[in-house]
Amino acid sequence: MVHPYLFLQFFRKLLEPLHISEAGADAIAYTWLIIALLLILSMLATKGLKTVPGGLQNFMEVIIGGVENMVVETMGHHGKPFFPLIATLAIFILVSNLIGLVPGFFPPTANINTTAACAVIVFVTTHVVGIKEHGFKYIKHFLGPILWLAPMMFFIEVIGHFSRVISLTLRLFGNMNGHELVLMIFFGLAPFLVPLPMMLMGVLVSFIQAFVFMLLAMIYIQGSLEEGH
């Protein structure tokens, strides 16, 4: 699903030699745009830091502080090392969701490749952290408490862990792509005031989906840090 007109059209020409689909090229182009915007915003917010923050610095400190508090409350103080990853994913997903509300812009999270990439990052981090924390004993997370049921539980747990990737991918993709479809239908029927309620709803959906993804990422990583039974 793409908007009737798009920003950064020249990226399509740039990506043509890679034989990427139109939707994929749009997602890549807008992902680069969001990364550039976040980098510029970070540099502006950290330029000339003051003890008493104001303006952009204060705004960014509120956001970062809120995410950090949520990480500590959910994962405990041993979850602080994962704060940069969680915050990066949350802010990237939120901005990606919100940018689709600007006419002519495409949200990267409405492309399944973007959401799958974010989900795979969480999946890999979860198991790398688990192996690093527990070593070979990490396999206990997959065996269950009853020894004679261990083979069956291992199979079930492996499927369950892979289903997390599918769940994270499809939940975010489905909500954002569905919202894009509905918004485009409303714009096609009545391009002025009628789509406004859906755009306001889109703001709420954008925040909720970013929060849900962040919360599940913290829960999965926290689970890998716990002792297996």
Swiss-Prot record:
Please name the source species.
Answer: Geotalea uraniireducens (strain Rf4)
Job description of the protein: Key component of the proton channel; it plays a direct role in the translocation of protons across the membrane.
**Locations listed in the record:** Cell inner membrane
The gene for this chain is atpB
- One Pfam family from the record: ATP-synt_A
Under the subunit heading, UniProt states: F-type ATPases have 2 components, CF(1) - the catalytic core - and CF(0) - the membrane proton channel. CF(1) has five subunits: alpha(3), beta(3), gamma(1), delta(1), epsilon(1). CF(0) has three main subunits: a(1), b(2) and c(9-12). The alpha and beta chains form an alternating ring which encloses part of the gamma chain. CF(1) is attached to CF(0) by a central stalk formed by the gamma and epsilon chains, while a peripheral stalk is formed by the delta and b chains.
**Which NCBIfam families does the UniProt record give?**
ATP_synt_6_or_A
* Family matches, as InterPro entries: ATP_syn_F0_a_bact/chloroplast, ATP_synth_F0_asu, ATP_synth_F0_asu_AS, F0_ATP_A_sf
List all membrane-crossing ranges: 25-45, 82-102, 104-124, 142-162, 181-201, 202-222
Q: Which UniProt keywords apply?
A: ATP synthesis, Cell inner membrane, Cell membrane, CF(0), Hydrogen ion transport, Ion transport, Membrane, Transmembrane, Transmembrane helix, Transport
GO CC term (a single one): proton-transporting ATP synthase complex
Task: Tell me one GO molecular function of this protein.
Answer: proton-transporting ATP synthase activity, rotational mechanism
Membrane topology term: Multi-pass membrane protein
Which GO BP terms, alphabetically?
A: proton motive force-driven plasma membrane ATP synthesis
According to UniProt, the name of this protein is ATP synthase subunit a
Q: Which PANTHER family match?
A: ATP SYNTHASE SUBUNIT A, CHLOROPLASTIC
Its family? Answer: Belongs to the ATPase A chain family.
